[in-house]
A protein has these predicted regions:
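Short, basic-rich loop-to-helix N-cap that marks the start of a DNA-contacting helix
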Residues: 1-10
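Histidine kinase transmitter module recognition
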Residues: 9-12, 44
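Short amphipathic recognition helices of helix-turn-helix/homeodomain-type DNA-binding modules
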Residues: 16-49, 53, 57-65
Length: 65
């Protein structure tokens, strides 16, 4: 979650974020996972971490830490 937050703060795209996650040895964002899908959609719409957390919370998903 920390790397996703940093990526959003840096204005990285979803593809760039997935590259960062892979380099760190973590799973990339996967659109068939509900939480990841919410993050991807909001990143594509240039939403902030706060806005993404609100969307995650509203859908009953864990927020970004």
């Amino acid at each position: 979650d920390k790397l996703i937050c940093l990526s959003i703060g840096m204005g990285l795209s979803v593809n760039e974020t997935n590259s960062v996650l892979k380099i760190a040895g973590l799973s990339p964002l996967y659109p068939k996972i509900k939480r990841d899908s919410i993050i991807i959609i909001n990143m594509n719409n240039n939403r902030s971490v706060v806005e993404i957390n609100e969307a995650l919370y509203n859908e009953g998903e864990d927020t970004l830490n």
